[in-house]
Design a protein with these regions (language model features):
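Noncatalytic, beta-rich nucleic-acid-contacting surfaces in large DNA/RNA-processing enzymes
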Residues: 1-484
Length: 487
């Protein structure tokens, strides 16, 4: 891993971030709808409204800032500039997190920060007396112990690779100097032994999870850009964000809840309006067609292309004819269950009862055409052909539970409602814990509900497994969803 560096060559790591695609898609959608081409490199750097949103912890979907712990940290940190964001991202990791209380205290102290030695003030002033970046360590060893630029970089490398033996050896040089290697050391520069060792101890603690500022800065810029898009163009941003996770129903469901909290309406998938991914439709977000299970990208792209070239679909038969043969029966059935064909005549139950007959009729017509055969249907006028059309049966729509069940089956979430909606008021008054409260916290690795704690839960059982212990006692494992959880 170090051969390139030892040869003096530049080594670079390129990270493929999904967020960059989200930004690009949002910018394209903004241009399509508003006629504005945003230059993300020229955004106002210190927009107070954007920082207000971040300080309130409303950062779901914002790069690096959407976890529960990070949202709480932003509420405590109250960042008002990019420098604060950079420090926040660098601090919020194992190791540096221990410095968060000290950093926040220093930030709120109004300049009353105490430094281990006066020479540290110009180096640590921007981070309120805390060592946050590798670059600060490099400057400390140069300014306090007289290291050269090259040697300070060796210390940085030792930290980044967590080379404890090298760091321990370097303590001697830092405190006492090394005349043979041209290092004066702290004592020669007027810093007493105890203070020098204390400073080095702090650097050792930091070195366990050393982070370079350039990395944190690059991430902070992307964080700010996504926060800016979320604040000023929430519909376009959330549509792009949900498209980026379209293959993960649980994540889509999470963002749908966020949209509803933001007052953004979610429209069902629609073959006459929808696109491959989530799209903006008159200030609302239209569900992406590719979120429907068992329907591949080529089918969706062909469907949209056919609609754009030859107009909207007029009926179920028209839809199936124009998309045959790439649209198989399973795909049509899932479109019906998802509500993507509600724009065409007939309810979902009617369509479920006739789509196979229509498919068989289309297949037979194609066989006759290939064989050069004519049917009775070909001999009548266009007006009389309507008498031969497969008609919708006279049946009522599925019940609410069935409709929701089909949506869950093909979309992975409940979209048009929730099976527990009628019990919302009672559940909100009665229950004391949600299903998410049993999940581990990302910081403490502990759930909100502890072992032995008595709580009242409420929800719908979606799965049950019965098992027997070695003593032949019955055990049951239940899967439960809460009313606030679409999945």
């Amino acid at each position: 891993m170090t051969i390139l560096e030892e040869l003096g060559l530049l080594k670079m790591d390129f990270l493929g971030l999904r967020t960059l695609t989200v930004i690009q898609s949002a910018v394209q959608e903004i241009e399509r709808i508003h006629g504005i081409r945003l230059n993300m490199e020229e955004l106002p750097e210190n927009d107070s409204m954007v920082y207000d949103m971040i300080c309130q912890g409303k950062t779901e979907g914002v790069f690096q800032l959407e976890s529960g712990g990070m949202k709480q940290f932003m509420r405590e940190l109250q960042p008002r500039c990019l420098e604060d964001m950079i420090a926040g991202i660098a601090l919020y990791r194992p190791g540096p997190m221990d410095f968060i209380p000290k950093y926040i205290k220093g930030k709120n102290a109004g300049g009353k920060v105490q430094y281990t030695h006066p020479k540290l003030e110009p180096i640590l002033e921007n981070t309120y007396g805390c060592i946050v970046y590798q670059e600060q360590v490099m400057q400390i060893v140069r300014d306090l112990a007289g290291y050269s630029l090259g040697r300070s970089d060796l210390v940085r490398r030792a930290m980044s690779k967590k080379k404890a033996a090298v760091m321990a050896k370097e303590r001697q040089n830092f405190v006492y100097g090394n005349e043979a290697e041209g290092v004066p050391g702290c004592i020669a520069n007027g810093i007493d032994e105890a203070t020098a060792n204390k400073i080095y101890d702090e650097m050792i603690d930091f070195a366990k999870y050393a982070f370079n500022k350039s990395h944190a800065a690059a991430y902070a810029v992307v964080s700010y850009q996504t926060a800016y898009l979320k604040y000023y163009y929430p519909v376009e941003f959330m549509a792009a964000l949900m498209t980026s996770v379209i293959d993960f129903p649980n994540k889509v469901a999470e963002y749908i809840l966020v949209c509803r909290q933001m007052g953004i309406k979610i429209l069902p998938p629609d073959v006459n309006c929808g696109m491959y991914g989530f799209s903006v439709d008159n200030g609302a977000i239209r569900y992406g067609l590719s979120a429907i299970k068992s329907v591949g990208r080529p089918v969706i792209e062909s469907l949209v292309r056919e609609r754009e070239e030859n107009g909207q679909y007029r009926s179920l038969k028209d839809f199936m004819e124009r998309n045959s043969p790439q649209m198989n029966k399973r795909a049509v059935e899932n479109f019906i269950k998802a509500g993507a064909l509600d724009c065409l005549d007939g309810n979902r139950r009617q369509k479920m009862l006739v789509y196979q007959k229509i498919s068989d009729s289309i297949s037979q017509d194609k066989k006759n055409s290939l064989a050069g055969q004519m049917s009775l249907f070909d001999l009548v006028s266009e007006e009389d052909k309507k008498e031969f059309e497969i008609r919708m049966p006279d049946v009522e729509e599925f019940g609410k539970e069935e409709l929701l069940g089909y949506e869950k089956e093909v979309l992975g979430i409940y979209l048009s409602g929730h099976p527990l909606e009628n019990y919302r008021g009672m559940m909100e008054k009665t229950i004391s814990a949600k299903t998410s409260d049993f999940q581990q916290d990302e910081e403490t690795n502990l759930p909100k509900v502890m072992d032995g704690q008595k709580v009242i839960i409420g929800g719908m059982i979606t799965d049950k497994t019965i098992k027997y212990t070695k003593n032949n006692k019955v055990m049951a494992f239940l899967s439960l969803i809460h009313i606030s959880e679409p999945t």
